[in-house]
Structures are given as structure tokens and as C-alpha cells.
């Protein structure tokens, strides 16, 4: 039952996810591609986590943050990809009202945590390049744990605001067809028959605050890093400093670039289908790419992987 009579209102009890396409052939093709991407995402990020855990030479703050980023990437992909895959197999994919709220909250929680983690990683790079003598003191285990815990708390608070205060206060009494492959705030706000203008404003402010604060930390950190690198006289030192920052800058550019497209640019400037494609890149592709970005340009990770594979071969 999709609707429930409640006094003078008809409340929606489930939503229909329209997904990416109605074309049966294209659905099969997309199912195969996205399933492969998801499996690579889980395998790649789990491998990163395990490699960091078992390799003593990777027991440094940068890799501590990277292991949590890998966990978050598995989470953000898992929050939407399984339901998307089911959507490809069914002619009519539905999600309950409660399930929609949980999916919205989990996706927002994990996305917010990733923003804070990327900012923490930028600060870690700043300390490593600009204050190498104080690095071990300033980036102690206690400080790293506090930054990670703070990232999760910040993500939880942001998600709680969106889900608890606003989603469950929305009244859905009309159409229940979401033109997306997951429960996102914008299409849900369009379906609500209650006044959501204030809610949209506050949620935009909340999401914008997370983005602006973390971007500010990243920009300031890399501004100081760039100044420090330009002052270096050693070519080898410059190359090493650049190499340690390149992978993180690439990940930051991809992540915040898609966030800007989805949540900052005016909705009139792109279609719903374009929004879906960018959302797939943001929630499905980037979690798969991050392990490749961080491992291909990192000699320590490649060295640790070779040592572990060598040990397995010898044993």
C-alpha cells in the first residue's frame, strides 16, 4: 500500500524510484557495469584498509586517515548501489517511507564525513610539509583519533538535522514517484505537499557550511604548502612534497567538483538526467577511483604491496 489515510490527509507510505532509465536493454548493460564497479570498489578499498593494517611502514597519520577514507568510500557506495542494482532488475522499484529516510540520512552522513576527512588529510599534509620537525608531536595518535572522531560527529550532526528535523516533518500526500535512483533531498522536497521553503533554506545552509568550512581548511592548508614548496632549494625535496600532495588534491578536486555541480550550481542550468549521471559519478565512480588515485602515485603503498605479495609468495 503506497498511501495511508490519516485524518484529512493521505500519507505516502512508500516511494517509487524511477531509476536511471526505462530501456530494458540499457538496464541490463548498466546493471553489469555498475555491479562490476561496486565489486571493484569494495575489493579495492578493503585491500587498502588491510594493507595499511598489516604493513608497519604504513602506520603513519596519512595512512590512518586514508584507511578511514576507504571505509567511508565503501559506505557511500553501499548506501545507494545495492538498491540501484535491484532497481535495474525490477520493473517497479519501491522503497518504504522509513527506508527512504534511512537512505537519505546514511548517504548524507557518509558524504559529510568524507568532507571532514579530506580536510583533516589536508591539515596532515600541511603539518608534514610546513612543520616537519613538529609533525610527530602535532599529529600524534591522540590528535589523529580526535580528528577522525570529530569527522564522524560532524557528519552525524549534519545528517541528523536533515533526516530527523526535516525529512520526518515533511508531509507527503500526493505523487510518490522519485525521479532518481535513490532518495535525495531535492526530489523529495519537490514531492512534499507541505511548505518546505524554510527547510530547504536551512538544509542548504547546513550542507553549504560543511562544504565551505572544509574547503576553507583545504585551501588554506595547500596555500601554505605551495608557498613552502616554492621556497625549497632542493629539487628532490620539491618533487617529494608535490608527490605526497598530488593524490589528495586529485581526490579533493573530483569530490568537490561533483558536489558543486549537484548542490551549488542553479538547478535550471542542467537537466534531471544530467544530475543523475553526476550523482552516479559522485556516489559510485569516485569511491572506486580513490584507491587507484592514492596507490598509483604513492611509492610507499606500492612498496608495501610488493612486500606483502612477496611474503605470500615465499610462504
Curated annotation (Swiss-Prot):
Glycans are attached at residue 8. InterPro entries: GPCR_Rhodpsn, GPCR_Rhodpsn_7TM, Olfact_rcpt. One of its GO terms (cellular component) is plasma membrane. It is found in: Cell membrane. This is Olfactory receptor 5P59. It is a multi-pass membrane protein. The chain crosses the membrane at residues 29-49, 58-78, 103-123, 137-157, 201-221, 242-262, 276-296. SUPFAM superfamilies: Family A G protein-coupled receptor-like.
Amino acid at each position: 500500500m503506497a498511501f495511508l489515510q490519516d485524518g484529512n490527509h493521505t500519507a505516502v507510505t512508500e516511494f517509487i524510484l524511477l531509476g536511471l532509465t526505462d530501456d530494458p536493454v540499457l538496464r541490463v548493460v548498466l546493471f553489469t557495469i555498475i555491479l562490476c564497479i561496486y565489486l571493484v570498489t569494495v575489493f579495492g578499498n578493503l585491500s587498502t584498509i588491510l594493507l595499511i593494517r598489516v604493513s608497519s611502514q604504513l602506520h603513519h597519520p596519512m595512512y590512518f586517515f586514508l584507511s578511514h577514507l576507504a571505509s567511508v568510500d565503501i559506505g557511500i557506495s553501499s548506501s545507494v548501489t545495492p538498491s540501484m542494482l535491484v532497481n535495474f532488475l525490477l520493473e517497479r522499484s519501491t522503497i518504504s517511507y522509513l527506508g527512504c529516510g534511512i537512505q537519505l540520512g546514511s548517504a548524507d552522513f557518509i558524504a559529510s564525513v568524507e568532507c571532514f576527512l579530506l580536510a583533516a588529510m589536508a591539515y596532515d599534509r600541511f603539518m608534514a610539509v610546513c612543520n616537519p620537525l613538529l609533525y610527530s608531536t602535532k599529529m600524534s595518535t591522540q590528535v589523529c583519533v580526535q580528528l577522525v572522531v570529530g569527522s564522524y560527529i560532524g557528519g552525524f550532526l549534519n545528517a541528523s538535522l536533515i533526516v530527523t528535523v526535516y525529512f520526518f516533518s515533511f508531509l507527503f500526500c500526493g505523487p510518490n514517484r522519485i525521479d532518481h535512483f535513490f532518495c535525495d533531498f531535492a526530489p523529495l522536497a519537490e514531492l512534499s505537499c507541505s511548505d518546505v521553503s524554510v527547510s530547504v533554506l536551512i538544509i542548504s545552509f547546513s550542507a553549504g557550511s560543511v562544504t565551505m568550512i572544509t574547503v576553507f581548511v583545504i585551501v588554506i592548508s595547500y596555500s601554505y604548502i605551495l608557498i613552502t614548496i616554492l621556497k625549497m632549494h632542493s629539487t628532490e625535496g620539491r618533487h617529494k612534497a608535490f608527490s605526497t600532495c598530488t593524490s589528495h588534491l586529485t581526490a579533493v578536486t573530483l569530490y568537490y567538483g561533483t558536489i558543486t555541480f549537484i548542490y551549488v550550481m542553479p538547478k535550471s542550468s542542467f537537466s534531471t538526467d544530467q544530475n543523475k549521471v553526476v550523482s552516479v559519478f559522485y556516489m559510485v565512480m569516485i569511491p572506486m577511483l580513490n584507491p587507484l588515485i592514492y596507490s598509483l602515485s604513492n611509492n610507499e603503498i606500492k612498496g608495501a604491496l610488493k612486500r606483502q605479495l612477496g611474503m605470500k609468495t615465499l610462504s
